[in-house]
């Protein structure tokens, strides 16, 4: 991350001109930056500047003590994960919509499967990363709490919500799909768990007779709701209209059992992991589905308690913060189930674990050169003037003014505002930044 951030900052400055407020970052600083974003999700404030406010009602000394606000915003401006100078175009066969974050996504998904082996029961469902900006694979889900955003398919352990694999949905594939989207999602995302006797639970969006048959061939068993008109279902199930509560109709073919059951409304299930139901009350497939389908919802719930990262225009950053947040949720699950560590102390919950993760990422890092008490004294000292011939740089007695050189070079703050300075050239009566702009402005004018 540090290498690519420095590379991107250099590439941008080749286009827009030198940035006097930027200096190369390091791995330690980027870890601290991530830790600050994690902590901001715990201590949520409405504006980014609030964390550095001197007003005790807003300010957060822990976050503001790591680095100045200007440095944090500079890292926000230039953070990058991959060199995009060689990114394939949309017409290229190698085009990947997730090119900017692909290495991170692949690395993290492999780590999820390596560090923890899930139990038998897994649920497959969709999650949403809230995003209202511009990206061609943004989705609208009116029935979801988060209606606009990027859709992510997840397979999670039913009991704990541990996410073992995920895949970002980037829209329709060229050439279409042979068996449909639902089939492809479940088959591809559960490949690492084939031939391991897992039981999968998913809803009717994914469910089909063909998918259940193919998963059964790789010793992976399913239970889920299914649309009554799906191809391959028995005609009796497809046409069933149950009238009384508790009424049940079952049809079996090999390991596959199709069940139609009337509760408050008529439900249809397809299962290869259950035995035919012969008792009273709700059938086994219904009970197991209700018990094991909520794995993805558990993971989502833990992730939304403490969101990581701030809102912005760049879609890929939402995926970065999603991965970091999901990693913390998974890490907490692994910690609580670990046999190597002693039993967690009373009160050491997800919140306490998350705060410790943020603190260890920061690990005492600070890029501040002066203590807070000394900064006030330094601000009142007379700044030594800089000179170039008869041109002299001095401090403006009143409020700051827009830097002439920054304006010419079209530099802006991360929020798009003009850059202001507290210094000006006495001879030219031109406001100029102390670091770089004073010399650059006069050198350019002398050359012309």
Give the label of every model feature segment.
Residues 1-448:
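Acidic, contiguous segments within the catalytic cores of piggyBac-derived transposases
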């Amino acid at each position: 991350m540090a290498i690519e951030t420095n590379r991107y900052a250099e590439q941008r400055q080749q286009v827009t001109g030198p940035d006097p407020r930027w200096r190369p970052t390091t791995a330690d600083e980027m870890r601290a930056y991530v830790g600050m974003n994690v902590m901001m999700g715990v201590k949520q404030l409405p504006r980014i500047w609030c964390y550095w406010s001197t007003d005790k009602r807003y300010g957060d000394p822990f976050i503001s003590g790591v680095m100045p606000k200007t440095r944090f915003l500079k890292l926000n401006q230039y953070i990058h994960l991959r060199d995009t100078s060689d990114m394939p175009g949309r017409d290229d066969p190698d085009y990947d919509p997730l090119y900017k974050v692909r290495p991170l996504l692949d690395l993290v998904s492999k780590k999820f499967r390596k560090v923890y082996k899930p139990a038998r029961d897994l649920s497959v469902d969709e999650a949403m990363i809230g995003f209202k900006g511009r990206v061609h694979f943004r989705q609208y889900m009116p029935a979801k709490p988060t209606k606009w955003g990027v859709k992510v398919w997840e397979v999670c352990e039913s009991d704990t919500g541990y996410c073992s694999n995920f895949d970002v949905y980037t829209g329709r594939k060229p050439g279409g799909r042979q068996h449909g989207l639902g089939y492809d999602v479940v088959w591809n995302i559960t490949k690492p768990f084939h031939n391991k006797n897992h039981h999968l639970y998913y809803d009717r969006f994914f469910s089909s007779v063909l998918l259940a048959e193919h998963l059964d061939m790789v010793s992976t068993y399913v239970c889920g709701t299914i649309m009554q008109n799906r191809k391959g279902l028995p005609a009796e199930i497809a046409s069933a209209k149950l009238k009384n509560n508790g009424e049940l109709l079952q049809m079996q073919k090999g390991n596959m059992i199709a069940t139609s059951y009337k509760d408050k409304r008529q439900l249809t299930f397809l299962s290869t992991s259950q035995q035919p139901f012969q008792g009273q009350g709700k059938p086994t497939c219904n009970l197991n589905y209700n018990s094991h389908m909520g794995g993805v919802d558990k993971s989502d719930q833990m992730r939304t308690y403490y969101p990581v990262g701030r809102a912005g225009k760049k879609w890929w950053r939402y995926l970065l913060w999603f991965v970091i947040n999901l990693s913390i949720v998974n890490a907490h699950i692994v910690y609580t189930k670990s046999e190597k560590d002693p039993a967690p102390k009373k009160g050491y919950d997800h919140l306490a674990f998350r705060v410790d993760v943020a603190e260890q990422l920061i690990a005492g890092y600070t890029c501040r050169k002066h203590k807070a008490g000394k900064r006030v004294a330094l601000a009142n000292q007379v700044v030594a003037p800089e000179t170039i011939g008869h041109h002299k740089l001095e401090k403006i007695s009143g409020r700051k003014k827009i830097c002439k050189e920054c304006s010419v070079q079209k530099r802006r703050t991360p929020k798009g505002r003009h850059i202001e300075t507290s210094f000006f050239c006495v001879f030219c009566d031109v406001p100029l930044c102390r670091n770089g702009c004073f010399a650059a402005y006069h050198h350019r004018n002398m050359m012309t």
